[in-house]
Amino acid sequence: GCTSVSLGTSGVVAAVSEAPVHDASGLVTGFADAAGAHLPLACTLNGARVLDAAKRVLGVTYDEFDALALSAAPGADGLVHVPYLEGERTPNLPGATGELTGMTLANLTPANFARAAVEGLLCLMGACLDAVRAQGVRIEEVTLVGGGAKWASVRSLSPSVLGVPVRVPPAGEYVAV
């Protein structure tokens, strides 16, 4: 079915399913539409603002941030950014804080920091996709929308990190997708 990944202030994975979902863990919320389809949804507290914060720390423009992130190797030479900057709801960790781990003198560079921020955010969205999949929803492709979709680094890295083809429609307001 259709699955969207929306990266705004928060991150949202929303799918369409023929069957209702009943997630005892509470990570996936089940909604329904007027036509009888079911709409499983997983939502994070931390979306594109994770990248805004990383960009601010680096003191660079959006384009410079993207160039830095895309210039670093996959995995950011072992630098890992856990993007729980405002706690988190998927997984349910309201008191969690962000982390930057795996730092060495060799890998603590602006490029690796930018790459780790993008990869960390996308891994968080991947966890949301996995939570929806665990409810029996097939996800073969995602549509990437929201302010985060404007970042070249997000568009470029999404397919490899999320593990599915990613479609990015023309910029617009897609709150109903």
Where are these regions (language model features)?
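Active-site core segments that coordinate phosphate-bearing ligands/cofactors
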Residues: 1-177
